[in-house]
């Protein structure tokens, strides 16, 4: 009763037939790939249309270097106009000591007053915006010792 029963010969036959089919299929696939390789290796020269050097197409938009030059010129013009706007006048010099006048000439301002809440020319009038970004976590899956750990937050 405790003996294991031997398999029936029918099952053996089925299995052997399936393995021979698989063997045959593998052999066919190998021969196909060889034929494909032979066909591929006929011409050693690269295809005419597929040249290794990138093709240059004439574009209507100006090249990046020209754009950069144009931007630089515009920046210079704006800087020149701003420097002309902020000239020290006689009214600014009234009631100032010699040190303050020298400081105005050097730095462009006379005192260290706070500009908080005041509109100042030339400053980028940017306001703090609360940007909520998606949290990023370190990867622990698909690496050694990864599954028994909680996800670590990357600040």
UniProtKB/Swiss-Prot annotation:
Keywords: mRNA processing, mRNA splicing, Nucleus, Phosphoprotein. It holds the Pfam family SNRNP27. The modification Phosphoserine is found at residues 61, 65, 111, 114, 132. Residues 1-97 are annotated as: Disordered. Phosphorylated in vitro by snRNP-associated protein kinase. InterPro entries: SNRNP27 (IPR013957). GO terms for molecular function: nucleic acid binding. GO terms for cellular component: nucleoplasm; nucleus; U4/U6 x U5 tri-snRNP complex. Belongs to the SNUT3 family. Part of a tri-snRNP complex. This is U4/U6.U5 small nuclear ribonucleoprotein 27 kDa protein. It comes from Homo sapiens (Human).
């Amino acid at each position: 009763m405790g003996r294991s029963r031997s398999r029936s010969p029918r099952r053996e036959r089925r299995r052997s037939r399936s393995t021979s089919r698989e063997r045959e299929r593998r052999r066919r696939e190998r021969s196909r790939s060889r034929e494909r390789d032979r066909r591929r290796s006929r011409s050693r020269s690269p295809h005419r249309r597929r040249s290794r050097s990138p093709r240059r197409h004439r574009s209507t938009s100006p090249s990046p270097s020209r754009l950069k030059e144009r931007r630089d010129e515009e920046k210079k013009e704006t800087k020149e106009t701003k420097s002309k706007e902020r000239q020290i006048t006689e009214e600014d010099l009234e009631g100032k000591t010699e040190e303050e006048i020298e400081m105005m000439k050097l730095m462009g301002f006379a005192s260290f007053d706070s500009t908080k809440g005041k509109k100042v020319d030339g400053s980028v009038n940017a306001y703090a915006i609360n940007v909520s970004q998606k949290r990023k976590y370190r990867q622990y899956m698909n690496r050694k010792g990864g599954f028994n750990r909680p996800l670590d937050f990357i600040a």
